[in-house]
């Protein structure tokens, strides 16, 4: 009986956020769809400006749950500018929460609506979200030999030509690092060794294609590159690295701290030629690896479980997130209170998903 109560209480921690985040998706897509139609005959910059604002509202609600609700402590190291910039965001990849870390930084620069992602191809089939991410400026890419460089270049160039604010998030490893997946780690290390690159322990060998294409297309438009290194501190990891939390585990408050190190790199310090950039990118991941080795394995307790340099405990004001949650939840609740609203809500899930899948099949 007691165990059942404990398990029930645990599950309730993520049930409310999950219901609200998924439950408001049709409301958000409807609002976006209406604006898409109304702005059809307006200059593209008007559509983009309000779309970015709508995206900011939804992602602020996401941060209400992932930051305010969980009470996670955000520790920032390095140099995060206060003002928004056009940037490429390069980070180590280890959890489904990683994309929310980009939000965590962007909202502190008033750039939350400008966040766009380079995403793996399979995510375009997500109901409602898959189509919308592409509409918002996300770019779906295939791995290795199937990578469509021309398609990515065309999309990025169109955003640059339109003056679209860019906070472009790329995870160069291409897949999530998991210390328990030893075969993946061994294959990554073998790949590096075959190419004469340093073998890495706490990150996977980065792939260059998406990063090179993004920089080559946007180099005259960018302000900088952000090299971001992230650690999710567990409650009891005994000094050993363990698998990073999933979204569900994170919402269950299993991650008390996120350590985020930001290195702002001026674009003039990034080599343009692909092979030189490959070496440069690998060197950046060598730096990450050394920081992570120090974080997890340093014999000095003063240097363990922290990044080098001074940390800032950055707390996000609930005033920036709660209004968005109340607005979207209120609109959704109002829709569900009438027969017509419920029908519209269900049809949005069904037909929005089908039309979205059709659209990404043709376009994305």
From Swiss-Prot:
Annotated tissue distribution: Widely expressed.
Pathway(s) served: Phospholipid metabolism; CDP-diacylglycerol biosynthesis; CDP-diacylglycerol from sn-glycerol 3-phosphate: step 2/3
Transmembrane annotation, as ranges: 15-35, 61-81, 344-364
First-listed, main subcellular location of the protein, grouped into a coarse class: endoplasmic reticulum
GO terms (BP aspect): acylglycerol metabolic process; CDP-diacylglycerol biosynthetic process; hematopoietic progenitor cell differentiation; phosphatidic acid biosynthetic process; phosphatidylinositol acyl-chain remodeling; phospholipid biosynthetic process
GO molecular function per UniProt: 1-acylglycerol-3-phosphate O-acyltransferase activity; acyltransferase activity
Keyword Endoplasmic reticulum assigned: yes
Motif interval(s): HXXXXD motif: 93-98
Family matches, as Pfam families: Acyltransf_C, Acyltransferase
Topology in the lipid bilayer: Multi-pass membrane protein
Subcellular location: Endoplasmic reticulum membrane; Nucleus envelope; Mitochondrion
Catalytic activity: a 1-acyl-sn-glycero-3-phosphate + an acyl-CoA = a 1,2-diacyl-sn-glycero-3-phosphate + CoA; 1-(9Z-octadecenoyl)-sn-glycero-3-phosphate + tetradecanoyl-CoA = 1-(9Z)-octadecenoyl-2-tetradecanoyl-sn-glycero-3-phosphate + CoA; pentadecanoyl-CoA + 1-(9Z-octadecenoyl)-sn-glycero-3-phosphate = 1-(9Z)-octadecenoyl-2-pentadecanoyl-sn-glycero-3-phosphate + CoA; 1-(9Z-octadecenoyl)-sn-glycero-3-phosphate + octadecanoyl-CoA = 1-(9Z-octadecenoyl)-2-octadecanoyl-sn-glycero-3-phosphate + CoA
Enzyme class (EC, first level): transferase
EC number: 2.3.1.51
Disulphide bond pairs: none
UniProt keywords, alphabetically: Acyltransferase, Endoplasmic reticulum, Lipid biosynthesis, Lipid metabolism, Membrane, Mitochondrion, Nucleus, Phospholipid biosynthesis, Phospholipid metabolism, Transferase, Transmembrane, Transmembrane helix
CDD domains linked: LPLAT_LCLAT1-like
Keyword Protein biosynthesis (UniProt): no
Family: Belongs to the 1-acyl-sn-glycerol-3-phosphate acyltransferase family.
Protein purpose: Converts 1-acyl-sn-glycerol-3-phosphate (lysophosphatidic acid or LPA) into 1,2-diacyl-sn-glycerol-3-phosphate (phosphatidic acid or PA) by incorporating an acyl moiety at the sn-2 position of the glycerol backbone. Acts on LPA containing saturated or unsaturated fatty acids C15:0-C20:4 at the sn-1 position using C18:1-CoA as the acyl donor. Also acts on lysophosphatidylethanolamine using oleoyl-CoA, but not arachidonoyl-CoA, and lysophosphatidylinositol using arachidonoyl-CoA, but not oleoyl-CoA. Activity toward lysophosphatidylglycerol not detectable.
Comment on protein domains: The HXXXXD motif is essential for acyltransferase activity and may constitute the binding site for the phosphate moiety of the glycerol-3-phosphate.
Protein name: 1-acyl-sn-glycerol-3-phosphate acyltransferase epsilon
């Amino acid at each position: 009986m007691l165990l059942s109560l404990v398990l029930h209480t645990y599950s309730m921690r993520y049930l409310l956020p999950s219901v609200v985040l998924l439950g408001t998706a049709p409301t958000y897509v409807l609002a976006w769809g209406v604006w898409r139609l109304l702005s059809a005959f307006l200059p593209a910059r008007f559509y983009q400006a309000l779309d970015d604002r709508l995206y900011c509202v939804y992602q602020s609600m996401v941060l209400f749950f992932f930051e305010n609700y969980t009470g996670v402590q955000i520790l920032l190291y390095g140099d995060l500018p206060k003002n928004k910039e056009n940037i490429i965001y390069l980070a180590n990849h280890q959890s489904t929460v990683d994309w929310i870390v980009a939000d965590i930084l962007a909202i502190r620069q008033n750039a939350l609506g400008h966040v766009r992602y380079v995403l793996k191809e399979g995510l375009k089939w997500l109901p409602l979200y898959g189509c919308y991410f592409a509409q918002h400026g996300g770019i779906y890419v295939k791995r290795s030999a199937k990578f469509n460089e021309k398609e990515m270049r065309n999309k990025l160039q169109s955003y640059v030509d339109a003056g679209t604010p860019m906070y472009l998030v790329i995870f160069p490893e291409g897949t999530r690092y998991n210390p328990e997946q030893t075969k993946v780690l061994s294959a990554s290390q073998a790949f590096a060794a075959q190419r004469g690159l340093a073998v890495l322990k706490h990150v996977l060998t980065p792939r260059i294609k998406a990063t090179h294409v993004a920089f080559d297309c946007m180099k005259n438009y960018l302000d900088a590159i952000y090299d971001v290194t992230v650690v999710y501190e567990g409650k009891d990891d005994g000094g050993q690295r363990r698998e990073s939390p999933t979204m569900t585990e994170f919402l269950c408050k299993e991650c008390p701290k996120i350590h985020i190190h930001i290195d702002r790199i001026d674009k003039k310090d990034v080599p343009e030629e692909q092979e030189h950039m490959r070496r440069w990118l690998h060197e950046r991941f060598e730096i990450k690896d050394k920081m992570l080795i120090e974080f997890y394995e340093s014999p000095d307790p003063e240097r363990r479980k922290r990044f080098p340099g001074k940390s800032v405990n950055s707390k996000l004001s609930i005033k920036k997130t709660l209004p968005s949650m109340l607005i979207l939840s209120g609109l959704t609740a109002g829709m569900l209170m009438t027969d017509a609203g419920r029908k519209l809500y269900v049809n949005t899930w069904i037909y929005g998903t089908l039309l979205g899948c059709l659209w990404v099949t043709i376009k994305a």
